[in-house]
């Protein structure tokens, strides 16, 4: 369960930022999580609930924004969600590049 190590890193980063801001409490964390990031959002939430205990993030809410995968045809530039077929519907090419959907980013946090 690599979500535990991700949650640990997330909380450690948030705690460091909170100390820098001289905050007393972390209220919420907003995370951008791509659908192709290879991270189970519910497992991450569970791991976060374990790691946040006994810290100034103990009552923090984890808000996860899901980022859908988006591909771009490398031949014609057509943007598309994950292609169901191997060929681009616009030009017939099978050369795709993932443009978004692998994000795992702490977008913002609220502290007091």
Curated annotation (Swiss-Prot):
A Pfam family recorded for this sequence: HypA
Binding site for Zn(2+): 73, 76, 88, 91
Superkingdom, natural source: Bacteria
GO biological process: protein maturation; protein modification process
Keywords for this protein: Metal-binding, Nickel, Zinc
The keyword Metal-binding is assigned to this record: yes
GO molecular function terms attached to this record: nickel cation binding; zinc ion binding
Cited InterPro entries: Hydgase_Ni_incorp_HypA/HybF_CS (IPR020538), HypA/HybF (IPR000688)
Binding site for Ni(2+): 2
UniProt function note: Involved in the maturation of [NiFe] hydrogenases. Required for nickel insertion into the metal center of the hydrogenase.
Family to which this protein belongs: Belongs to the HypA/HybF family.
Name assigned to this protein: Hydrogenase maturation factor HypA
This protein's encoding gene: hypA
């Amino acid at each position: 369960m690599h979500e535990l190590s991700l949650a640990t890193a997330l909380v450690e980063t948030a705690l460091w930022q909170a100390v820098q801001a001289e905050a007393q409490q972390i209220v919420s964390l907003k995370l951008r999580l791509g659908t192709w990031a290879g991270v189970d959002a519910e497992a991450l939430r569970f791991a976060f609930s374990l790691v946040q205990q006994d810290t100034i993030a103990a009552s923090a809410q984890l808000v996860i924004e899901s980022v859908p995968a988006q591909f771009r045809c490398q031949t014609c530039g057509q943007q598309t969600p994950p292609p169901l077929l191997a060929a681009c519907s616009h030009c017939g090419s099978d050369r795709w590049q993932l443009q978004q959907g692998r994000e795992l980013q702490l977008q913002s946090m609220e502290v007091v």
